[in-house]
Regions:
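Conserved Rossmann-fold NAD(P)-dependent oxidoreductase catalytic core, especially the SDR/UDP-sugar
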Residues: 96-141
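SDR active-site strand-loop-helix element
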Residues: 6, 30, 73-74, 113-119
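Conserved beta-loop-beta element that borders a ligand/cofactor-binding pocket
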Residues: 151
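A glycine-rich helix N-cap at a beta->alpha junction
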Residues: 146-147
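Conserved glycine-rich Rossmann-like NAD(P)H-binding loop of the short-chain dehydrogenase/reductase
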Residues: 25-32
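N-terminal Rossmann NAD(P)H-binding glycine-rich loop of SDR-like oxidoreductase domains
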Residues: 3-23
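Short loop/helix-cap segments at secondary-structure boundaries that form the rim of catalytic
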Residues: 36-43
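NAD(P)H-binding glycine-rich loop region in Rossmannoid oxidoreductase-like domains
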Residues: 45-46, 50-95, 122-129
């Protein structure tokens, strides 16, 4: 299977690359940052360094058209503390980015997709009475990200 990873040089993306290669997949990735020097990034992975939010739909579509599967291992996480109000920042980085990639993946004929989100989504689903998505804009964006991916 040919798999395209958005965010393949981050922690989850990097280890996903390794695991996919181990299972015989062909892997390509679009990453915002080059891999850290201390990582032995696999030469078999086609690596393109670019900000997915700044490249054109046509360029992103070209990556997706070469893939059977997509893994979205990008977005902004809760370690980032944006200026108030925080929700628009998290929405743009998680929900809008996912909507765009999934729309283009569908257009490209990608057969399968996996979204790496957050353990907060699992907590939100397990304990809805806590209303976690109402208490933090990051959690809200990750819950909405999953819904956006399903559309």
């Amino acid at each position: 299977m040919k798999t395209f990873i958005v965010g393949g040089t981050g922690f989850l993306g990097y280890y996903t690359c390794l695991e996919l290669l181990r299972h015989g997949h062909k892997v390509s990735t679009l990453a915002h940052m080059p891999p850290p020097d201390e990582l032995d990034f696999p030469q078999e992975v086609k690596l393109d360094i670019a900000d997915m939010n700044k490249i054109s739909d046509e360029d992103l579509l070209a990556h997706l058209q070469a893939a059977d599967g997509l893994i979205f291992a990008a977005g902004v996480d809760d370690r980032v503390v944006p200026k108030a109000p925080a929700y628009p920042f998290f929405y743009a980085g998680n929900v809008s980015a996912t909507e765009r990639v999934m729309r283009l993946a569908k257009q490209a004929g990608v057969k399968r997709a996996v979204i790496f989100s957050s353990y907060f989504v699992a907590c939100h689903q397990m304990w809805p009475e806590l209303k976690l998505s109402e208490s933090h804009p990051y959690i809200k964006s990750r819950v909405e990200q999953i819904e956006a991916a399903k559309r």
